[in-house]
C-alpha cells in the first residue's frame, strides 16, 4: 500500500514566553522558605486565602468553613493535600466589617530549590491538583503520605497570649521551568537562600531546527535540451544539443521564475526559501505615540486602608473636647489618606522596547552578548542551550526610539539575517525534518 499524509503533532511552541505564571513579574519569587547561617527558617510570600471570619487558626490548620448539617456547627479545616489553593484569595476587595481575619497560604520548603514564579511549573500529584511530593518512595496503600508541614505565624508586636494570624502549608514539589531560564542570579549556589529570592527569569528563545539551503544560488534547472544532455535521457531526438549562450539561459531562467512558484520548486529539493518579516529586516518607524501617561490602580481604587472609628465634639464640657460617636457612626471605617495608590507604566515604550529586544537584540552576533553572573553554560557554543542562555544588554536597543523612517542594525544585514523566528523558512525546514508541528509522511510498502 501507499499512504501519504500530514501528521499534526499538536503542541508546538514557535514563540517566546511561558504559559506558567506568565503575568508574574519576572523577578518575583514563589512563596518559599530558606535557612539562614544560624539554620533558622525564613518564610517569604503571600498568604492569600482568608479563613472563616471569627474562627481561629488551630493545630489542624486554617478554618475554611462550617458544617451545620448535623445541627451542631463543626469547623472544617483546609485539606492540606491541596488547600489552601494558591490561586484562591478574597472574594472581593470589600472588607468593612472590622473583623480580624486569619489567613493561610502555601510555601515551598527550603529543600525545593527556589525559582522565579514566572515560568514555574510543578506537576500535580493528586486528583484535586495538589503538587506536594510523596514522602515515601512508594505511595501507601491507603492514604498517600505527602511532604507537607504546617508553619504558624503571629504578629511580631505580640509579646504574650500568642495567637497565630497566619498558617503556611509548606511542601516540597517537583519544581520545573520548561519555558524559561535564569538570567539574573545573585547567589552563587542553586540552593534556596535570601539572595536567590531576587533571581530573574527570561523566556526561552524560539527553537527552530532546520538545515540551510545548499543550492541558495540556484534558481531553476532544466534537464532537457536546453542544457545539452543526451536526448535519450530527455525522450527527444538522439542528438547532442549545444549549450545556449549565457544570455539565452538567463532569459529562460527568468521566464521560469515568472511562471512558476520558487517556493514550491525548492521544496522538491527539501529546501525552503527564506522569507523575512519586513518589520524585522528593515524596521519601519513612523513615530511612536507616547503622549498620555498610563496608570494602574489597586482593585479597590484606593490602596491600603486603615480602620477608623467615628468621633464627635463633646457638648457637655466647657472647652471643646472630643468623644467617640458610636451611636450613629460605625467603628470600622476603612479609610485611605492621601492620593489613591497608583503606579505608572509607559506601555508604548515597553512594547517598542520589547519588540526591539526580541527581534533585534536576541539575534545579534554572540560577541554582543554575555553570560549572566553565576550561570554556567555549555562550552560548545553551537548548542541551543548556550545560544538560549546568552543575553544582550537592553541598552543596545533602548536608545532607538526615534530611528528614522527606514533603519536596521548592521548585524541584521550581514550576520545570518535569516536566522530569525519570524522567518517562514525555518518552520518549513523544521517540518521537512519532522521537527515542526506538521509532519508530512509518505509510507510505501511493496506488495
Curated annotation (Swiss-Prot):
The keyword Acetylation belongs to this UniProt entry's keyword annotation: no
Family, similarity comment: Belongs to the adenoviridae hexon protein family.
GO biological process, one term: symbiont entry into host cell
Species assigned in the record: Human adenovirus E serotype 4 (HAdV-4)
Protein name: Hexon protein
Subcellular location: Virion; Host nucleus
Gene Ontology terms: cellular component: host cell; host cell nucleus; T=25 icosahedral viral capsid
Induction: Expressed in the late phase of the viral replicative cycle.
UniProt miscellaneous comment: All late proteins expressed from the major late promoter are produced by alternative splicing and alternative polyadenylation of the same gene giving rise to non-overlapping ORFs. A leader sequence is present in the N-terminus of all these mRNAs and is recognized by the viral shutoff protein to provide expression although conventional translation via ribosome scanning from the cap has been shut off in the host cell.
Keyword terms, alphabetized: Capsid protein, Cytoplasmic inwards viral transport, Host nucleus, Host-virus interaction, Late protein, Microtubular inwards viral transport, T=25 icosahedral capsid protein, Virion, Virus entry into host cell
Subunit structure: Homotrimer. Interacts with the capsid vertex protein; this interaction binds the peripentonal hexons to the neighboring penton base. Interacts with the hexon-linking protein; this interaction tethers the hexons surrounding the penton to those situated in the central plate of the facet. Interacts with the hexon-interlacing protein; this interaction lashes the hexons together. Interacts with host dyneins DYNC1LI1 and DYNC1I2; this interaction might be involved in intracellular microtubule-dependent transport of incoming viral capsid.
Function: Major capsid protein that self-associates to form 240 hexon trimers, each in the shape of a hexagon, building most of the pseudo T=25 capsid. Assembled into trimeric units with the help of the chaperone shutoff protein. Transported by pre-protein VI to the nucleus where it associates with other structural proteins to form an empty capsid. Might be involved, through its interaction with host dyneins, in the intracellular microtubule-dependent transport of incoming viral capsid to the nucleus.
Ranges where the record places region Disordered: 121-140
InterPro entries from the UniProt entry: Adenovirus_Pll_hexon_N, Adenovirus_Pll_hexon_sub2, VP_dsDNA_II
